[in-house]
């Protein structure tokens, strides 16, 4: 399923879609950051600090470094909350193409 906005994400979760491609850069970057937090490669406290204090650059894999702003940190935090509520785990299949696999009930 191709994701263009947050409503598409809610729809994908409702329908338990297992593979998505995110066309929206902000949402795609938020997914990449959320994936780093879920995998223990980025402490969640970093998102909290960014939401309060500004921006930073984070390496998300495959040589891609993205600027993380307050807005992006807030979006990533919302995603992580939704993932926790539904016991969803994401797997980054391709960083540059923003392709993700979603596992439910893990």
Please report, for each region that a protein language model flagged, where it lies by residue:
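Acidic, low-complexity, intrinsically disordered interaction modules
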Residues: 58-64, 68, 72, 76
